[in-house]
């Protein structure tokens, strides 16, 4: 709120499902006698509010995706979705840095945390690197500088990343390595 954001509460039940290509959970609204869908994203509702003139909106809420489940993917999860008019990627990066830094300070009394044996400093601003530069810095491999997609896939494999798509581009290899 200190930065002029308005918290919204988009509907959890939708008809039709929208905002992502994920499969929704389906329920039935008895009074209206129609199928309804638990939301898979809040994106469209929040973007409609931006188009309608609200310049800074967010929601912290539950999403539901009727898809696979494993230790990294739960069908029900909480997200924060933030939209802001009249900014660009750098403005959103600044916002996220401030959010992480302030939350860490409020919760821990410091902007430093220990995670998996590492000391992480969440003091803004953070280091900003293009993906290829980050991968090059941490692996010594230049995915965009290699000669072909095939070579990029070989580098990924050498670094322990097996690409499911055997025709993946160097961009896909870079994304998986990142």
Regions found by a protein language model. Give the residues of each.
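Class II aminoacyl-tRNA synthetase catalytic cores and aaRS-like
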Residues: 1-178
């Amino acid at each position: 709120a200190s930065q002029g954001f308005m918290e919204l509460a988009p509907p959890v039940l939708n008809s039709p499902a929208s905002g992502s290509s994920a499969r929704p959970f389906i329920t039935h609204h008895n009074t209206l006698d129609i199928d309804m869908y638990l939301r898979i994203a809040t994106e469209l509702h929040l973007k409609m509010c931006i188009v309608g003139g609200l310049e800074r909106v967010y929601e912290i809420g539950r999403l539901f995706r009727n898809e696979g489940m494993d230790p990294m993917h739960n069908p029900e999860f909480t997200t924060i979705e933030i939209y802001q008019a009249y900014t660009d990627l750098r403005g959103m990066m600044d916002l996220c840095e401030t959010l992480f830094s302030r939350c860490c300070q409020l919760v821990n009394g410091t902007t430093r945390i220990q995670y998996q044996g590492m000391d992480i400093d969440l003091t803004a601003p953070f280091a900003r690197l293009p993906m290829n530069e980050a991968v090059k810095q941490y692996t010594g491999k230049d995915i965009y500088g290699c000669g072909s997609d095939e070579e990029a896939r070989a580098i990924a494999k050498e670094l322990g990343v097996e690409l499911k798509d055997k025709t993946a581009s160097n961009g896909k290899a870079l994304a998986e390595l990142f």
